[in-house]
């Protein structure tokens, strides 16, 4: 298990590991491929005498580089097996919709959409940067590696998004008025960030928080904790961590360019 995922769990208290499925519950399969990692988790929200609780039945992560298409399906099979569940037990799918590089991000979103269609269950998209920023106190920016010497970023104040998501040169983060920057982009451009980079923060979106944001905003009950998102999607402002349709958030065109029409040859 990736250490950054574990640290995010410690930050967010409502999750408990090992709750049995003896109470009315919703089982969510969460995944994210917006970064260099493939991450997945099985999270359960259960109704009990003490109210609603969420727990992590299993989670896994693997640094994929550009092998998301090869590694995601085995990762999902493994995390379901770890949780003692089968794919038919899943009640909803939550997926990080980016922003992220074209190929890796598309793998996760297409897989989540296909699972939802095959199982007849809803698929909820979550901004992948929110899955990091929602659990962090204070004024913080989350930066992912956008390649081309750029970062995907969003800014948060006590778990509420106040700017972004956007794609820019890393120097733009110096103008946000944040106290620290976390994520893979912060690590990659630590020298540019002049002491704002926090290497102890999460590097990749924790799948547990992808599930939590989906549970809190998809109308399944409750709110998204520190994120403060409420109810079904609407026209929420930037400070509201709203649910999203499972559509990739690329923010820019892919590197690959489709060939133009064939040129006519004249005599």
For each feature predicted by the language model, list its residue ranges.
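Intrinsically disordered, low-complexity terminal tails and inter-domain linkers enriched
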Residues: 4-16, 44-55, 216-240
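N-terminal beta-alpha supersecondary unit
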Residues: 12-95
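Surface "functional belts" at beta-alpha junctions
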Residues: 14-18, 23-25, 46-55, 61-67, ...
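Short, well-ordered alpha-helices that flank and scaffold nucleotide-derived cofactor binding pockets
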Residues: 78, 113, 117, 191, ...
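Phosphate-handling active-site elements
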Residues: 83-88, 116-126
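DPxDG-like acidic metal-binding loop motif
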Residues: 92-122
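Glycine-rich phosphate-binding/hydrolytic loop that grips phosphoryl groups
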Residues: 201-219, 231-248
């Amino acid at each position: 298990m990736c250490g950054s995922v574990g640290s995010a769990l410690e930050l967010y208290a409502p999750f408990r590991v090992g709750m049995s499925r003896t109470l009315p519950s919703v089982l969510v399969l969460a995944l994210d491929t917006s970064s260099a990692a493939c991450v997945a988790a099985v999270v359960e929200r259960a109704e009990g005498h003490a109210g609603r609780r969420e727990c992590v039945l299993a989670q896994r992560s693997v640094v994929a580089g550009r092998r998301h298409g090869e590694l995601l399906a085995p990762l999902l099979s493994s995390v379901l097996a770890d949780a003692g569940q089968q794919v038919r037990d899943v009640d909803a799918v939550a997926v990080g919709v980016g922003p992220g590089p074209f190929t890796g991000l598309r793998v996760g979103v297409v897989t989540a959409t296909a699972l939802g269609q095959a199982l007849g269950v809803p698929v909820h998209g979550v901004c992948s940067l929110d899955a990091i920023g929602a659990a962090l106190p204070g004024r913080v920016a989350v930066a992912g590696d956008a390649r081309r010497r750029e970062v995907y970023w969003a800014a948060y104040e006590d778990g509420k998004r106040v700017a972004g998501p956007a794609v820019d040169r890393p120097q733009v983060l110096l103008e946000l008025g944040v106290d620290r920057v976390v994520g893979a982009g912060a690590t990659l451009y630590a020298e540019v960030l002049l002491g704002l980079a926090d290497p102890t923060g999460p590097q990749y979106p924790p799948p547990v928080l992808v599930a939590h944001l989906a549970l809190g905003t998809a109308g399944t009950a409750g709110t998204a904790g520190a994120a403060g998102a409420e109810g079904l999607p609407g026209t929420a402002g930037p400070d509201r961590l709203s649910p999203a349709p499972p559509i990739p958030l690329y923010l820019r065109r892919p590197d690959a360019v489709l060939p133009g029409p064939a040129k006519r040859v004249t005599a």
